[in-house]
């Protein structure tokens, strides 16, 4: 073999197919404002109003969020009221005025448990106890859905929307259950373990998706969980 052929061979080895640039899609999850629920009943999918009177809180939220994001909300009014309060804080987040409704981001369906007080629920089903949620992830309330099912529902919507809006910022105003479900999907953890996440009203959870040609479904990074306004600055 000649020296020229060796050089040609070595050069060819260095000429690899370029790897496509990774596309980052950032999800900004916001749990809705506190509901007006003086009797402290299980509300789940109940369409209760939210208390959005804390102006300083929404100023802080507005400062955390990116400009020109796609805004999504569940079908329930408390998520839309929360989005409107964020828009009203500085007028900058124009798309928050009319967020796109995403049915798959609605709260878990608690079936016959919805509307009960906690004492009534205990009397009806003493075995359903869970330290952080209404029931274990696998258990379906009578006439409702399990948290396992909720995770599958939310995961499918996230995958669909991440593909459709790759490279964008997506703000999703939703509920405690769907945000825990999003964490389960991004981290690839069991639904039961995801119930251990604390998700406060008006907190922000950010999940970043990176496309990866070598890994189907891409890679997820958790940038913040349950972050309340006033502790971080908008990027």
What do these predicted regions represent?
Residues 2-12, 22-94:
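Active-site-proximal alpha-helix that buttresses catalytic centers in soluble enzyme cores
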Residues 2-26, 88, 108-120, 163, ...:
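Acidic, low-complexity terminal tails and accessory targeting/binding regions
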Residues 27, 69, 168-174:
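Generic beta-sheet signal
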Residues 49, 89-155, 224-226, 234:
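Phosphate-handling substructures
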Residues 59-63, 151, 155-163:
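Generic structural signal for well-ordered alpha-helical scaffold segments
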Residues 73-74, 152, 173-174:
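Short beta-strand scaffold positions
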Residues 176-180:
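GST superfamily/GST-like fold recognition
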């Amino acid at each position: 073999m000649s020296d020229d052929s060796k050089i040609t061979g070595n050069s060819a080895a260095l000429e690899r197919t370029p790897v496509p640039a990774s596309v980052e899609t950032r999800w900004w999850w916001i749990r809705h404002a506190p509901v007006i629920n003086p009797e402290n009943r299980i509300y789940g999918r109940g369409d209760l109003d939210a208390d959005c009177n804390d102006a300083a809180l929404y100023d802080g939220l507005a400062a955390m969020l990116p400009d020109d994001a796609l805004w999504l909300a569940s079908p329930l009014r408390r998520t839309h009221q929360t989005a409107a309060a964020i828009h009203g804080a500085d007028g900058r987040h124009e798309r928050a005025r009319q967020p796109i409704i995403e049915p798959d981001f609605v709260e878990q369906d608690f079936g016959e448990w919805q509307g009960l007080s906690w004492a009534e629920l205990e009397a009806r089903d003493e075995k359903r106890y869970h330290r952080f949620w209404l029931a274990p992830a696998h258990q379906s309330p009578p006439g409702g859905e399990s948290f396992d099912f909720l995770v599958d529902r939310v995961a499918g919507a996230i995958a669909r929307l991440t593909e459709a809006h790759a490279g964008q910022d997506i703000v999703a105003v939703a509920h405690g259950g769907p945000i825990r479900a999003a964490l389960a999907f991004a981290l690839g953890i069991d639904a039961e373990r995801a119930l251990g996440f604390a998700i406060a009203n008006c907190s922000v959870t950010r999940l970043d998706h990176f496309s990866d040609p070598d890994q189907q479904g891409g890679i997820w990074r958790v940038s913040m969980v349950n972050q309340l306004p006033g502790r971080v600055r908008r990027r």
